[in-house]
């Protein structure tokens, strides 16, 4: 009897183990969020430059076809010689608004002739910018007819800073060369492609 009970118990346990129900799990695929691919276009940057220098460098590349480091460095070196990137500077060093500079040059490139000086004001009146600001002067500088006349000489490539100084001279008409070429070569070292 013991053997029959033991066999019956073993059979019952085996049957109940086989009779267990199994649940089938369905795999749920995770929600896929598509990330748009943004094309990165490298440009010349100057990480160790002032915010004003960085702004002008970016705007020159954004609104012209200048891609040569030496050309950009030459323009930057000339601006540094003229104004140290201080937009509201009157020749001699006074920091004044556009309307309060009564003699000499004014602004980023020291607009000196009455025509060029007045055209800065007219441009900013027409396009809603401040002629005393970095942004307004940079816009005017890039669009000014004198700069536009010599722009193709900067948009070429492969010249030295010294060679780019020729169109820079005609663009600015400086009286004193000063350190503009030294500043330009300094920018050549500081400007990086990234």
Predicted regions, residues:
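Peptidoglycan-targeting cell-wall enzymes and recognition modules
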Residues: 32-56, 81-157
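Active-site or metal-binding loop neighborhoods of secreted/extracellular toxin and effector enzymes
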Residues: 156-194
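Residues that form generic nucleotide/phosphate-binding pockets
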Residues: 59, 144, 191
């Amino acid at each position: 009897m013991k053997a029959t009970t033991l066999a019956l118990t073993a059979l019952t346990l085996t049957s109940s183990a086989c009779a267990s129900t199994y649940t089938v799990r369905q795999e749920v695929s995770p929600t896929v969020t598509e990330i748009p691919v943004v094309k990165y276009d490298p440009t010349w940057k100057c990480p160790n430059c002032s915010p004003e220098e960085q702004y002008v460098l970016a705007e020159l590349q954004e609104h012209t076809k200048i891609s040569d480091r030496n050309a950009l460095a030459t323009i930057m070196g000339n601006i540094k010689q003229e104004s140290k990137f201080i937009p509201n500077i009157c020749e001699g060093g006074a920091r004044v608004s556009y309307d309060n500079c009564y003699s000499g040059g004014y602004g980023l490139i020291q607009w000196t002739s009455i025509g060029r000086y007045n055209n800065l004001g007219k441009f900013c009146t027409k396009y809603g910018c401040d002629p005393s600001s970095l942004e307004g002067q940079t816009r005017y500088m890039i669009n000014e007819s004198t700069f536009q006349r010599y722009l193709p000489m900067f948009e070429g490539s492969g010249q030295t800073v010294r060679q780019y100084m020729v169109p820079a001279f005609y663009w600015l008409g400086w009286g004193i060369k000063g350190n503009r070429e030294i500043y330009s070569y300094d920018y050549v070292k500081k400007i990086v492609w990234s």
